[in-house]
Amino acid sequence: LLHVLAGHAVCRGTAGAHFTGLLRRSFMGYDVSFHPISPEEMREWYFTPLSWVQQGQEEKVLALAAQHGMEDFYAEKYLDTLRVGAGTEPDELFDKSHGFYIAVIQGFFRDYYYTRGSAFSFLVEEKPEYARYFTPWAQVTPTAFPNPAENQIIENYCSGVYLSPKQVTQLLRDLEQDPKVLEDLEGLWSNGQLAVLKKALTAAAELGVGLLEATEVVEPNPIRPNESTSYSNLYHCDRDGVYLYIDTVSTQLADVIGKSEEQA
């Protein structure tokens, strides 16, 4: 089903084969974002307001947004996101519906962080032992949901793993004290990206909250940055990872142009 969410088309459904995910990662890439949020905030900002929308009490959502100083434009986007969430069918993947929407709504309340193509979901595919840092949705949601969950990124427009507040502090500690953890993460978050991930983890730790990853909440345009888009609040996206992406693409373009000139 194709739903329109705040002026953008969002493809929703239960499809999400692992093979499809690998293909997309190889050829299309992923815009990965990291969202500091606690289970309590998920309840306060998403699950409870979701029930308000389902009960026809949308004015409560706008009151909550105003209470947090949210601008009217983003308050409406917030409400639109909850409306889409309220229409989620019980057989839709949690990761492609509620999980993704939680990442979106987090960005209306506070900053989130971006890295191109690097995610814990991809790390745990190669190194399953890293699952010790993640908490499945069944242990996070305030009530049981019928929606099946993969608990990781399986395709675009999808939530990934969730690190609890304790897991955030544990991973930060291990990054400092365990050379193997540092090496493994540097292997995936390369070319300066690890600093962005540590910034996200540190922000979450300082707030005493967990960290949720997702894909395509924000989609930077490295060629025309002013045309970047976000289902959430674009201005709450930390710029460091975006600048790294722009620099990488600029370097790649320069290489391509240089080679084509050599061949001419």
Give each language-model segment a name.
Residues L1-F27:
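Short, Lys/Arg-enriched N-terminal segments with co-localized hydrophobic residues
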Residues L22-A264:
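Acidic (Asp/Glu-rich) sequence patches and key acidic residues
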